[in-house]
A protein has these predicted regions:
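Alpha-to-beta junction loops
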Residues: 84-90, 148-150, 211-220
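Early extracytoplasmic/lumenal segment of secretory-pathway proteins
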Residues: 27-104, 114-115, 221
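Solvent-exposed loop/turn segments at secondary-structure junctions
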Residues: 41-44, 74-77, 95-99, 133-136, ...
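Ligand-binding pocket segment of bilobal, Venus flytrap-like solute-binding proteins
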Residues: 177-242
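Stable alpha-helical elements in mature extracytoplasmic
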Residues: 41-45, 49, 77, 86, ...
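Extracellular/periplasmic juxtamembrane helices and adjacent flexible linkers that interface
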Residues: 258-338
């Protein structure tokens, strides 16, 4: 892990007293506060996790910690942080959105190596949420391009989940058409012609489908779909497509902010603790796939662990995928506006 000795010493001097004989760190203030800027679908996860972390931090340091949450479409959230929304940590939908904050000079190089599993403490995938009984008999991506099917998915220009949705559909079409890009684009175009509304974030899309009754199928984060079924077991069911994508949400400390506020210790521990057994089970209980493979196996009755998943590496990594598909004038714009 990259060390930042000068900034770390400055931060520690502001908030702690070091016991010269015992080597024990004593936290002078009674309380500390941090802000976690996250994406749309993590509200329930962090509501539960924050309570666990508050107990952990209190036991470890004697300090109370107040945690403020901010949620929205991942791309939009990254832009907000880059433009001045003060976040001690970010827990966003994908690596590229954290890179955008790094490019703004707020996060140091090498952030992806700061925490285990490429700073992805949990993963997810993309599934379909349909109405109970599956009246349109939706089984796979092919069914989403039928003319009588209304699709709900967020806008990939603002939502991280929407970008995962798009790439999962692209992977299916690539397999179906043996890499013929013209046919792939036609397939994606037909899918988006069926989209009734492009909400800015995944939670907004869920609201459109679940609460407003729009559409026949919601392309959704796996955890978001499971939460809907949990809340409305008589109204919805999940369909797992034949091909999907390994979605890897990313976490990072916002270095410039924590060094200014003197919150590096608590911010780093906040993200480190996501890898603890307790936090990994909190992730699983909220329908995220734990990065700890042993704990993931505890949820084999919940998740389809044999699902065929492509990865972002199949698209050349996030930088290439963003530039090719989601940049202004990229393939998504060409398809959607064409």
């Amino acid at each position: 892990m990259k060390r930042r000795w000068k900034s770390a010493v400055a931060a520690l001097a502001a908030i702690v007293t070091i016991g010269s004989l015992t080597g024990v760190t004593t936290y002078a203030a009674d309380s500390v506060s941090i802000t976690n800027v996250s994406y749309d679908s993590t509200r329930e996860l962090y509501e539960q996790y924050n309570k666990s972390f508050q107990e952990h931090w209190k036991e470890k340091t004697g300090q109370d910690v107040e945690i403020t949450q901010s949620h929205g479409g991942s791309g939009k959230q990254a832009l907000e942080v880059a433009n001045g929304l003060e976040a001690d940590v970010v827990t966003l939908a994908l690596e590229y959105d954290v890179d955008a904050i790094q490019d703004a000079g707020l996060i140091d190089d090498g952030w992806v190596d700061e925490f285990p599993e490429d700073s992805a403490p949990y993963t997810s995938t993309i599934v379909f949420l349909v109405r109970k009984g599956n009246p349109k008999n939706i089984k796979d991506w092919d069914d989403l391009v039928k003319k009588d099917v209304g699709v709900i998915t967020p806008n990939p220009k603002t939502s991280g989940g929407a970008r995962w949705n798009y790439l999962a559909a692209w992977a299916y079409a690539k397999d179906k058409y043996n890499g013929d890009e013209d046919k792939i684009k036609e397939f994606i175009g037909d899918l988006y012609k069926n989209v009734l509304v492009l909400d800015t974030g995944a939670r907004g899309a869920t609201t459109s489908f679940v609460e407003n009754g729009q559409g026949d199928v919601l392309i959704a984060w796996e955890n978001e779909a499971y939460l809907s079924v949990k809340d409305y077991p008589d109204d919805y069911e999940i369909v797992t497509p034949s091909i999907s994508i390994l979605a890897q949400p990313s976490v990072a400390v916002v270095d410039k902010v924590v060094d200014k506020r003197g919150t590096r210790d608590v911010a780093e521990e906040y993200l480190n603790y996501l890898y603890s057994d307790e936090a990994q089970r909190i992730a699983g209980d909220n329908y995220y796939r734990p990065s700890n493979q042993d704990i993931l196996k505890e949820y084999s009755d919940v998740f389809d662990l044999d699902i065929n998943l492509v990865t972002i590496d199949d698209f050349g990594g996030w930088k290439k995928a963003q530039e090719t598909h989601f940049s202004d004038g990229g393939i998504f714009d060409q398809i959607y506006e064409g």
